[in-house]
Amino acid sequence: TSPVAFLTKPARWMQLLGSHRWGLTAAPNFAFDLAAARTADADMAGADLGNVLAIMSGAERVQPGTVDRFAKRFAPFNLSDSVIRPSYGLAEATLYVATRLPGAAPTVIPFDAEKLSQGVAERGSVGTPLISYGAPTSPAVRIVDPESRREVAAGRIGEIWTRGDNVCRGYWNKPDETAEAFRGGWFHSGDLVREDPDGFFYVVDRKK
């Protein structure tokens, strides 16, 4: 199906997944919202999502509420929330930096909103919910204080830097932008994240 066909009738996406075995698909966050809101039970007649291998969410910030609504909407059609994989990628890194491994539902943790505004991501019983993108598996990733340019300790907020064979060398005919973003052999993403001691990270904000 084409992007236009999906926008015209978002149910087509789930219909295709439900009519084939071993489905694997990826889409941005807004597509999950559209599919959940505009797919009727009648659209899913005879569909079975029990054999879906993975549904990756990327290309824009993954919203915990969207993932929850999507999982609940299609649970009656045997969709397991463990196949939903929040993913973090960059065009500059050939789209892929990290994704949550399959086998468990996406992890959503509340963080103290006041502490987040101070540059500290501290877990709390209530607060701003952030979703885990898993552990980075791009060739090389650092979480760095953008001012000191030193790696931050677990639990602190820093900018994600990456480098490797999958990372481009710069922007075509844009020397100023290239000089700003590609420094010291690393691509500076502009995304601020919090990394757990186990290596899993949560996107907090944008620096640029």
Walk through the language-model features, giving the residues of each.
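ATP-dependent adenylate-forming carboxylate-activation enzymes
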Residues: 1-17
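Conserved strand-to-helix beginnings and helix N-cap segments that scaffold or border functional pockets
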Residues: 10-11, 64-68, 172-175, 200
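Alpha-helix N-cap/helix-start capping motif
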Residues: 10-11, 29-30, 60, 165
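Gly/Ser/Thr-rich phosphate-binding loop
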Residues: 17, 22-26, 38-128, 140, ...
